[in-house]
Amino acid sequence: NICRSPMAEFVMKDLVAKAGLSDKFEIASAATSTEEIGNPVYPPARRKLAEHGISCEDKTARQMTRRDYETYDYLIAMDHNNLRNMARFVGGDPEHKVSLLMDHTRRPGDVADPWYTGDFEATWQDVLEGCTALLEELR
């Protein structure tokens, strides 16, 4: 929860604010693994957001919990591995709340993981496209 998911969290918050819909959404991100719990957003991800005028100050990684499934209407995964981990946390998806971000676009699949690729621009493009499409669906 230090690269893609916080990028998606803060991009979505930015899009929602620009649409004048902030009072209609509660947006957060959480980790599906434990490695980075408590750590801030990875500096290159933070810089990529800042390039677009988006701050993620004070964000630290937190662990996803079963309560997240009860609290949120939608749980959006960045890749298939996240989907599997999320299903484990929430005990399946009986309410059909879980989906991949890119499945809301014309290019379904995984969001590029910059932790491995080093390509934060490709991740930015995926996240922006996915969040824009998701917001359009939810309007």
At which residue positions do the language-model features occur?
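Phosphate-binding/catalytic loops
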Residues: 74, 80-139
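Helix N-cap/beta->alpha junction signal
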Residues: 5, 79-80
